[in-house]
């Protein structure tokens, strides 16, 4: 009888040992809980412009229910150097929770940046460019898609608007200078070339001045330009912080009456300068929408949503068919709205842009749009 009892006990222990643990136990749940997969957005530098884009990323995360899919989107701000982007891309290759990467490329021809983008792609990670692209002529296989502004068109719009401002002041010839962070950046170069093309042959571009994303240097560049070219007729700001830098130095020198100022993007300070009469017009992108569409695209690539990809890129495979553009706005002073004699009208610009992709807004109307989305700049 004793031997029988021992045998039964041993069998009981053996059976217990062979049972599978409860998969719903707290310990098991804790060990297997999934860390959210991340979509990473790498900026080219640190500027409030990217805060607006990040607001769009988070709005996109909510709109497309990333959390329900075990995903999140995170913005990482680069230190305004190519090496910073290279190093971060290399780090992301080694991280298991990266599902997709969007990058605003700081140098369009930087081979190392493109090579690191390709390494991510080879690992199965979706990679796109947003806001700043690579040079597609040199690196046709560097990325599948771009989201952002058609910067050549944007430059032509600014050049056309600037020429109208100059002509309204009786200035039909003279020199202009363009200011940006980097002259070899894809979006900056396309804008400057487009502006030079559209402003016309009567106006000569005498310099392009880069500040390497240094806001203090941006102001110093304007001061230097005014010393070197005292008769300059127009100053053109290409990146968001260039606009307030130009406006501040022109006000400091007391020469607003003889210098026209037209710029890109609507930094909060630039909006105030326009309200005070220190900027003539601004071409404004839609970084908020860039953020929303970035999430939409990365999710579609992650989940193989072919219908979304076709909707976003109906002409994929054709020249320019890999680009999703997010529209442009021309912001004008309130005094020009409904004024038949205003220097600029939408009709003046229609030849430079496709139908339906340009809005002309007064500053007050634009401010209302910003307020609607809780933004201070765009």
Please state what every model-predicted region is.
Residues 85, 146-174, 218-219, 266-270, ...:
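Hydrophobic alpha-helical segments within soluble ligand-binding/sensing domains
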Residues 99-122, 195, 207, 211-273, ...:
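Hydrophobic alpha-helical
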Residues 14-17:
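C-terminal motif of bacterial Sec signal peptides marking the signal peptidase cleavage site
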Residues 63-79, 173-178, 195-215:
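Short beta-strand elements in bilobed, periplasmic/extracellular small-molecule ligand-binding domains
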Residues 19, 25-35, 175, 179-183, ...:
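Hinge/cleft segment of the Venus flytrap/periplasmic-binding protein
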Residues 49-65, 154-158, 186-203, 221, ...:
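Short, solvent-exposed amphipathic alpha-helices that sit
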Residues 33-60, 64, 72-89, 104-111, ...:
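Extracytoplasmic "Venus flytrap"
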Residues 116-153, 267-273, 279-280:
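Flexible loop/hinge segments that line or gate small-molecule binding clefts
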């Amino acid at each position: 009888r004793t031997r029988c009892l021992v045998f039964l006990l041993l069998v009981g222990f053996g059976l217990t040992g062979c049972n599978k643990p409860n998969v719903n136990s707290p310990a098991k749940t804790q060990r297997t809980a999934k860390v959210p997969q991340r979509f990473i957005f790498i900026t080219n530098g640190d500027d409030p412009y990217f805060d607006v884009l990040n607001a769009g990323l988070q709005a996109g995360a909510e709109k497309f229910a990333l959390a329900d899919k075990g995903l999140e989107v995170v913005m990482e701000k680069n230190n305004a150097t190519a090496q910073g982007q290279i190093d971060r891309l290399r780090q992301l290759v080694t991280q298991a929770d990266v599902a997709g990467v969007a990058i605003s490329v700081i140098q369009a021809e930087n081979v190392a940046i493109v090579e690191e983008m390709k390494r991510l792609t080879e690992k199965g990670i979706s990679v796109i460019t947003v806001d700043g692209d690579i040079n597609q002529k040199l690196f046709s296989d560097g990325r599948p898609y771009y989201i952002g502004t058609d910067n050549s068109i944007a430059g032509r719009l600014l050049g056309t608007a600037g020429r109208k401002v100059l002509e309204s002041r009786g200035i039909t010839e003279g020199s202009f200078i363009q200011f940006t962070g980097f002259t070899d950046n894809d979006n900056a170069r396309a804008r400057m070339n487009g502006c030079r093309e559209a402003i016309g042959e009567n106006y000569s571009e005498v310099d392009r001045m880069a500040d390497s994303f240094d806001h203090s240097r941006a102001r110093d560049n304007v001061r230097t330009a005014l010393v070197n070219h005292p008769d300059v007729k127009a100053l053109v700001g290409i990146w968001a912080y260039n606009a307030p830098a130009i406006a501040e130095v022109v006000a400091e020198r007391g020469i607003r009456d003889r210098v026209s100022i037209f710029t890109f993007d609507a930094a909060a300070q630039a909006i105030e300068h326009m309200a005070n009469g220190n900027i003539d017009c601004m071409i404004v992108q839609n970084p908020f929408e860039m953020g929303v569409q970035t999430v939409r695209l990365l999710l579609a690539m992650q989940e193989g949503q072919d219908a979304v990809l076709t909707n976003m890129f109906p002409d994929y495979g054709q020249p320019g068919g890999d680009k999703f553009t997010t529209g442009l706005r021309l912001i004008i002073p309130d005094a020009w709205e409904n004024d038949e004699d205003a220097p600029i009208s939408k009709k003046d610009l229609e030849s430079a842009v496709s139908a339906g992709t340009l809005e002309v807004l007064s500053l007050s109307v634009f401010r209302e749009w910003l307020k609607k989305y809780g933004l201070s700049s765009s």
